[in-house]
Amino acid sequence: MDRIIEKLDHGWWVVSHEQKLWLPKGELPYGEAANFDLVGQRALQIGEWQGEPVWLVQLQRRHDMGSVRQVIDLDVGLFQLAGRGVQLAEFYRSHKYCGYCGHEMYPSKTEWAMLCSHCRERYYPQIAPCIIVAIRRDDSILLAQHTRHRNGVHTVLAGFVEVGETLEQAVAREVMEESGIKVKNLRYVTSQPWPFPQSLMTAFMAEYDSGEIVIDPKELLEAHWYRYDDLPLLPPPGTVARRLIEDTVAMCRAEYE
């Protein structure tokens, strides 16, 4: 339940509006509310980090509003809480009125939800499940440059899960659609909340089965097999894509060195 911020309130401050995050001096604000001119604003505690509260403040600041990507180098737990704040702020902003009857909505006091004051419909934050998969072929890994990555970064394949589809089916479909190959021996690795804007990445490793690379030009600029010790520019540390690549490299080194 949200409340008015008082002078001595302290902690981490996730100040967000329209999927942007307030980052004075390029950092997530930490300290007393008065130091950031937040006294009198409404805040909702969305978690704790290292014993300190993490607050969500739905507010637009004139300066220093940036992307949550700018804090990806934070500790994983704090980055996830910052992402939670940005996603919740957008959820509350976009669910002021009921999609069924049009009446005004209000936030639940017990969970992350919005409730209709008229028809009692209940809405939850949207989460879009995605798959991401590292594909190994002997001593090489399949890496691709996506059309949305114009900075030369090469990464593993990924895509959204479709309605009525299992995660395993999504992997097989996305890999075939984007690269034209089939995979086998699929193994789940980990997951990562990814607030761009509201994804949940489910990460897998797989082995090459059959087929030749034929890219989907709408999705990829190129895709190639890269030997584990001769890789192109990779995604930054802290991303699940980077972890998948590093795990694959470690497996190759254990087998070929």
From Swiss-Prot:
The keyword Zinc applies. Keywords: Hydrolase, Magnesium, Manganese, Metal-binding, NAD, Zinc. Residues 125-248 form the Nudix hydrolase domain. Substrate binds at K25, R69, E111, Y124, Q192, P193, W194, P195, F196, P197, Q198, S199, A241. CDD domains: NUDIX_NADH_pyrophosphatase_Nudt13. It comes from the Bacteria. A motif (Nudix box) lies at residues 159-180. One of its GO terms (molecular function) is NADH pyrophosphatase activity. InterPro entries: NAD-cap_RNA_hydrolase_NudC (IPR050241), NudC-like_C (IPR049734), NUDIX_hydrolase-like_dom_sf (IPR015797), NUDIX_hydrolase_CS (IPR020084), NUDIX_hydrolase_dom (IPR000086), RNA_Hydrolase_NudC (IPR022925), Znr_NADH_PPase (IPR015376). Divalent metal cations. Mg(2+) or Mn(2+). Its cofactor is Mg(2+); Mn(2+); Zn(2+). SUPFAM superfamilies: Nudix (SSF55811). One of its GO terms (cellular component) is cytosol. One of its GO terms (biological process) is NADH metabolic process. A divalent metal cation 2 binds at E174. A divalent metal cation 1 binds at A158, E178, E219. Its EC number is 3.6.1.-, 3.6.1.22. Homodimer. Belongs to the Nudix hydrolase family. NudC subfamily. This is NAD-capped RNA hydrolase NudC. It comes from Escherichia coli O1:K1 / APEC. The gene is nudC.
